[in-house]
Amino acid sequence: MNIYAVGGAIRDALLGVPVQDRDYVVVGATPEQMAAQGFRPVGKDFPVFLHPDTQEEYALARTERKTAAGYHGFQFYYAPDVTLDEDLARRDLTINAMAREVSPDGTLIGPVIDPFDGQADLRARVFRHVSDAFVEDPVRILRIARFAARFADFTVADETLALMRRMVDAGEADALVPERVWQEIARGLMEATPSRMFDVLRECGALARVLPEVDALWGVPQRADYHPEVDTGVHVMMVVDYAAKQGYSLPVRFAALTHDLGKATTPADVLPRHVGHEGRSVELIKPLCERLRVPNECRDLALVVAREHGNLHRVMEMGAAALVRLFERSDALRKPARFAEMLQACESDARGRLGLDTQPYPQAERLRVALVAARSVDAGAIARGIGNDAMQIKDAVHRARIDAVKQALAIAE
């Protein structure tokens, strides 16, 4: 039995970046031998085991053969006679098809095993497929795009990009299960430069298949006085990258991605103006989230940001009454943490514009001050002083919040 560290752990160590994934391949072993050494089986389709002490994953060396469309359409073969090179040959990219032997005490020993010249591609900053078997798994299209978001200075080899385009043309991207699409998109959004993921997906044609609502944004003009970058797709990518640079959460980054979807449906005769795009964005976000089974916290923030981002940008012109109505519509009084994420998404929108990434956004501080004041109103005490008239209570609480916001803004100014 020989154990090897493979894939991302070797790649990241060679790049000098923190190792995010540790995967191990076991050559020359049977499931029974693994169990006898205390490893716990967890794999459904092929033998994967958890180490008894570290709980890291160890997989038996295997080969695979495509038997049907989609992510699950594979038949696996594993046996003690499967070699390390055979296991590495089934991997997606040359930079992920390297290994080093692991000693009994867990340290890496010996040279890097690199049958497909992954080290050369690392030096050249190139994503290159290992073999034509790449076409058998459409998830690999999404994975390359996600890697591009992590390693923004890498490019996709011409022959690999051509292969990805052929896969898309053959309908392989249409066979992707929604949960896996969301998983990869979400992981890419959380990388350092999410826009690179969408660049790669656009280049191979996959974005139009998995996120047509986003793909439609490129080529849609905006007013240059508000958006020096003009193109809506370019703007949205700048917004997402700004949110990533600030380290914002996945819900904020997803809201950044989707806040302007409605601009793609603006009638051509009114361009570059986009009156009413907020409501149209909401109507596109709903089915998108249902289709990809987007988590509720991401969907809910995306919807409220899409609906209200224009209003948040205009809060310097709003009085106390309008601010309180905004808080009530956006449920900020009950969910201040979500409202804080709304501010982050809207700040990203304001600064995700050509040459404006450091412009002041005083709207955020005005809203923070106003919300603290509105939430300081003791609705329970007001209710007790009025009795059982629900409408009268609601009106009194509303007016008290307006008064509190007026006072707070007067002090702040």
From Swiss-Prot:
Cofactor mode of binding and number, as noted: Magnesium is required for nucleotidyltransferase activity.
The positions annotated for binding ATP are 8, 11, 91, 143, 146
TM segments?
none
Alphabetical GO biological process terms: RNA repair; tRNA 3'-terminal CCA addition
In terms of Gene3D superfamilies, this protein maps to: Beta Polymerase, domain 2, cca-adding enzyme, domain 2
The UniProt record gives the binding positions of CTP as 8, 11, 91, 143, 146
Molecular function terms, GO-annotated? ATP binding; CCA tRNA nucleotidyltransferase activity; cyclic-nucleotide phosphodiesterase activity; magnesium ion binding; phosphatase activity; tRNA binding
Cofactor(s) needed: Mg(2+); Ni(2+)
- Residue ranges of the HD domain? 232-333
Tell me what reaction this enzyme catalyses: a tRNA precursor + 2 CTP + ATP = a tRNA with a 3' CCA end + 3 diphosphate; a tRNA with a 3' CCA end + 2 CTP + ATP = a tRNA with a 3' CCACCA end + 3 diphosphate
Binding of Mg(2+) occurs at 21, 23
Sorted alphabetically, which keywords does the UniProt record give? ATP-binding, Hydrolase, Magnesium, Metal-binding, Multifunctional enzyme, Nickel, Nucleotide-binding, Nucleotidyltransferase, RNA repair, RNA-binding, Transferase, tRNA processing
Give its E.C. classification number.
2.7.7.72, 3.1.3.-, 3.1.4.-
In Pfam terms, one family for this protein is PolyA_pol
Task: State the remark under miscellaneous.
Answer: A single active site specifically recognizes both ATP and CTP and is responsible for their addition.
Instruction: Write out the similarity annotation.
Output: Belongs to the tRNA nucleotidyltransferase/poly(A) polymerase family. Bacterial CCA-adding enzyme type 1 subfamily.
Q: How does it assemble?
A: Monomer. Can also form homodimers and oligomers.
- Identify this protein by name: Multifunctional CCA protein
Name the encoding gene, please. Answer: cca
